[in-house]
C-alpha cells in the first residue's frame, strides 16, 4: 500500500502533492529513533514533549513522511509532513488500515473498569480456549496467542502496537481477541479503529485521579467503550455497581446484559459457599441455570466469573461448557496468589495487585475468613500518582487488618517519606503498625514475626517484577521476596510470634 492509498483509507487529506505520496509504506513508527527506510512516522503528543517535533529526525532516519498534530508546527512545503487536527484518532485509523482492519477478522472482546480487568480477561480467554477457539489475550501482564507471548508495557498498547498484535493474532489463526481497555487508552483514543463484539464494565472506584480531573471524568473515559464508535455488539454491565447502573440507563435494553448478586441481574449467583480454595453456588442466566464451582476466592471474584460467563454467552458459548471449564481455571499471576514453600507451612502468605482503596478492601475481606490468626497487611502506594487515595488505603488497612506494615511501592520520583506520611495520615494512632520504607525488609519482618496461623497479605505489586526508584526500574518481585523470607523463617523459628 502506498502512502496516498493509506491516507485515503484513513480519511486523511494531505492537502498537497509530493513524490512521497506514491511511495510504499513499509512500517508505521511512533518513535523517530525506530524509523527506517519506508517508515511512516506518526508524531504523538506526550506528557512532557510534543512527539511531532521529532519529524526531522524521523525523515533523516529514512521515513518517507510524517503525520503530526498542529502543535508540531512544521514548515510548510519543506518535506512530506501532513498535519491532522485529530492525531490520536488519525493514528488509530492509519494503524487499522495498514494492518488490514484485524478487528474485522476476529471477534474482539474488551473489558474496562477499575478492578477486575485482568482476572476477567484471563477467565474469558480460558473459557474460549477450552471450548476450542484459539484466542489472543492482551492486557496488563502480557500479550499472548498461540505460539507467542511477550510481557506488556501498558495495560492497553498504543494504537500501532495494538493493531500489529491483533493482526499477528489473526495470522496465527485466532478466532477471538480478549483485551483489557484502560481509561488512559480510551481517553487517548488508542483503541480507535477497533470494533468490539462484546464490551464489559466491571466497576468504577477511585484510581488514576492524577490523570483524570475527577471521578466523573474517569467515568466518561470508561463509558466511551460502550458508544457506537467502538461497540457493535452487546455490553456486559456490573448491575451491582452504581456506575454500571448508569451505563445501563444509556443503552437500549436489548443491547446489554447485567451481572451481579442482585436478584434482577441477568447473570446472577446465589447460595454461595466461600472456601479457602474457591467458591461454590448456583448460577442463573438467560441460557439456564447451573452449578458454580470456581477456584477463585472471594465475592469480588464471583463478580469476575459472572462477567466472564456473560461475555462467553454473548459470543455463543454454552453455559454447561463454561461451567465445566471454570473448574480448572489456573488463576492469574499476582492475583490472590499464595506463596508456599511446603504443604505444612504454618502461615498463609498471599501476594496481590490490589492498589486502590476498593481493591484493598475486597482483598482483605476475602482473606479474613480463612486466616485463623492475625491478618497482617503489607502495602504502600505509588509515587507521582493520586495522593488522595493514600490515607483512604491506610484507613482501610487499619480497619480490616490486625497489623499494618506500611512500606514503599513504586516511589518513582516522589519523596518516599511523603508517601508514607500520606498513608499514615489515615491510620489511627492506636493501630498495631510497623513503618518500614524498605519493601524487602518490610516483607521479611512481617513474615518473620508472624505467629502460626497468621496470614501475611502483601498488596500493591502483584505480578510486577520490578520497583521504580526515581527514574530507575530495578528488579523486585514480592513473590520472590516472600519465598526468601519464608526460607529465613525456617532458619529462625524462635522469632515467630
Curated annotation (Swiss-Prot):
Pfam families: Mur_ligase, Mur_ligase_C, Mur_ligase_M. A motif (Meso-diaminopimelate recognition motif) lies at residues 409-412. GO terms for cellular component: cytoplasm. Transmembrane segments: none annotated. Its cofactor is Mg(2+). One of its GO terms (biological process) is cell division. UDP-N-acetyl-alpha-D-muramoyl-L-alanyl-D-glutamate binds at residues 32, 155-156, 182, 188, 190. Meso-2,6-diaminopimelate binds at residues 385, 409-412, 460, 464. Its EC number is 6.3.2.13. The modification N6-carboxylysine is found at residue 222. GO terms for molecular function: ATP binding; magnesium ion binding; tetrahydrofolylpolyglutamate synthase activity; UDP-N-acetylmuramoylalanyl-D-glutamate-2,6-diaminopimelate ligase activity. It is found in: Cytoplasm. It comes from the Bacteria. Carboxylation is probably crucial for Mg(2+) binding and, consequently, for the gamma-phosphate positioning of ATP. Pathway: Cell wall biogenesis; peptidoglycan biosynthesis. It catalyses: UDP-N-acetyl-alpha-D-muramoyl-L-alanyl-D-glutamate + meso-2,6-diaminopimelate + ATP = UDP-N-acetyl-alpha-D-muramoyl-L-alanyl-gamma-D-glutamyl-meso-2,6-diaminopimelate + ADP + phosphate + H(+). The keyword ATP-binding applies. InterPro entries: Folylpolyglutamate_synth_CS, Mur-like_cat_sf, Mur_ligase_C, Mur_ligase_C_dom_sf, Mur_ligase_cen, Mur_ligase_N, MurE/MurF_N, UDP-N-AcMur-Glu-dNH2Pim_ligase. Catalyzes the addition of meso-diaminopimelic acid to the nucleotide precursor UDP-N-acetylmuramoyl-L-alanyl-D-glutamate (UMAG) in the biosynthesis of bacterial cell-wall peptidoglycan. Belongs to the MurCDEF family. MurE subfamily. This is UDP-N-acetylmuramoyl-L-alanyl-D-glutamate--2,6-diaminopimelate ligase. It comes from Thermosynechococcus vestitus (strain NIES-2133 / IAM M-273 / BP-1).
